[in-house]
């Protein structure tokens, strides 16, 4: 692994596997793991749906940015970010500058199927009010250029977790 790498950020849409891959990658590297959504819910004292309903999206995004800054201040950490972390320019800049950022890219159909199978993901507030597959397609179309701007590497997120971890580990060796 490149000697300057001390943080890995995982970005991508909802249900792209950021937390699952992040935990496995952190274990492989012997590093800590941080999840910005978990940091936000811990600080807010409620789940994200409640936070957004009571305080609004701007308050959530502010707390999300704070969580990213806190995670970026740590060393030897793999950070799973919320799907909308890239919406703010300052977050994209921090992701580029503070470590190696990997975009877990998935086909819309795979994300929609994961969301349909996992009730926990269904607890997140809808961004558009549309059907899951339509919302995923719209959100990914909007965010794809932002993920590309923030990421140093793109990895297919629909492979087995162990394969994704191997792919990222190999990329880190050259970062």
Swiss-Prot record:
Specify which residues bind ATP according to the UniProt entry for this protein: 12-19
Primary residence:
cytoplasm
> Which GO annotations describe the biological process of this protein?
amino acid biosynthetic process; aromatic amino acid family biosynthetic process; chorismate biosynthetic process
Entry-linked InterPro entries: P-loop_NTPase, Shikimate/glucono_kinase, Shikimate_kinase/TSH1, Shikimate_kinase_CS
Q: Name one GO cellular component term.
A: cytosol
**SUPFAM superfamilies linked to this entry:** P-loop containing nucleoside triphosphate hydrolases (SSF52540)
Q: Which UniProt keywords apply?
A: Amino-acid biosynthesis, Aromatic amino acid biosynthesis, ATP-binding, Cytoplasm, Kinase, Nucleotide-binding, Transferase
Q: In which pathway does it act?
A: Metabolic intermediate biosynthesis; chorismate biosynthesis; chorismate from D-erythrose 4-phosphate and phosphoenolpyruvate: step 5/7
Q: Name one GO molecular function term.
A: shikimate kinase activity
One Pfam family of this chain: SKI
Reaction(s) this enzyme catalyzes, per UniProt = shikimate + ATP = 3-phosphoshikimate + ADP + H(+)
Q: Where in the cell is it found?
A: Cytoplasm
| Lineage top rank: taxon | Bacteria
The record's EC number reads: 2.7.1.71
State the family it belongs to.
Belongs to the shikimate kinase family.
Q: Which HAMAP family match?
A: Shikimate_kinase
Q: Which NCBIfam families match?
A: PRK03731.1
**By what name is this protein known?**
Shikimate kinase
């Amino acid at each position: 692994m490149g000697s300057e790498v001390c943080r890995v950020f995982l970005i991508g849409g909802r249900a792209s596997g950021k937390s699952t891959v992040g935990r496995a990658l952190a274990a492989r590297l012997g590093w800590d793991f941080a999840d910005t959504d978990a940091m936000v819910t811990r600080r807010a004292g409620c789940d994200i749906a409640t936070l957004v309903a009571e305080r609004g999206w701007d308050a959530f995004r502010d707390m999300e940015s704070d969580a990213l800054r806190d995670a970026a201040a740590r060393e030897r950490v793999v950070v799973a970010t919320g799907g909308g972390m890239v919406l703010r320019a300052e977050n994209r800049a921090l992701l580029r500058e503070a470590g190696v950022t990997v975009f877990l890219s998935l086909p819309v159909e795979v994300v929609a199927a994961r969301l349909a199978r996992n009730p926990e993901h269904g607890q997140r507030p809808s961004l558009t009010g549309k059907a899951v597959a339509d919302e995923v397609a719209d959100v990914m179309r909007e965010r794809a250029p932002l993920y590309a701007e923030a990421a140093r590497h793109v990895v297919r997120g629909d492979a087995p977790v162990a394969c994704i971890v191997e792919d990222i580990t190999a990329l880190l060796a050259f970062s």
